[in-house]
A protein has these predicted regions:
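Nucleotidyltransferase catalytic core that binds NTPs
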Residues: 2-156
């Protein structure tokens, strides 16, 4: 199992990739959307990232481009796990200050345009929030999804 972390010091190297836009050609033109981790069917050599991806901003684009680059080089498929509703809405229901940049429909469209092949929108519940990071990585990402590589930002 290999893990790749996109650290702060790598961002400068990846800037040119971002400036070129989503330039790695996507082998599959259609995004496949799954509404839970259990719906996802194993694919060949999944290259995975996870996060809320609200706004698909500059940092997200760098991670997505790296995900696609690795998938292309490893003959894998890109997989992105996100959550609905946003975790803060579940964990802090009385905090009405959270304003999302995109609706889920907009996020799906942006991720499709970015060239993601598989999008898992997992329900974020109080019960799911009790999953430890170790359980999430070991039980879900490694054992259930059988990932080939994991790409994450430096702040995750």
């Amino acid at each position: 199992m290999n893990y790749l972390v996109c650290r702060k010091d790598l961002f400068n190297k990846l800037i040119s990739t971002f400036e070129q836009g989503f330039n790695i050609q996507n082998r599959n033109q259609n995004l496949k959307v799954y509404h839970s981790i259990s719906e996802f069917k194993n694919v060949s050599r999944p290259i995975l990232t996870t996060g809320t991806f609200d706004g698909v901003h500059f940092g997200h684009k760098i991670i997505i481009n790296r995900l696609k680059e690795i998938a292309q080089n490893q003959k894998g498929e890109t997989v992105l796990i996100t959550f609905s509703p946003h975790p803060r809405m579940v964990l802090f229901p009385d905090d009405h200050q959270l304003q999302l940049i995109n609706t889920m429909e907009e996020k799906i469209k942006l991720l499709e345009q970015a060239g993601i092949e598989h999008l898992i929108i997992h329900p974020f519940t109080k019960d799911f929030s009790r999953t430890t990071s170790m359980q999430f990585v070991r039980d879900i990402i490694v054992n259930q999804l059988n990932i080939h590589k994991l790409v994450i930002g430096y702040n995750h």
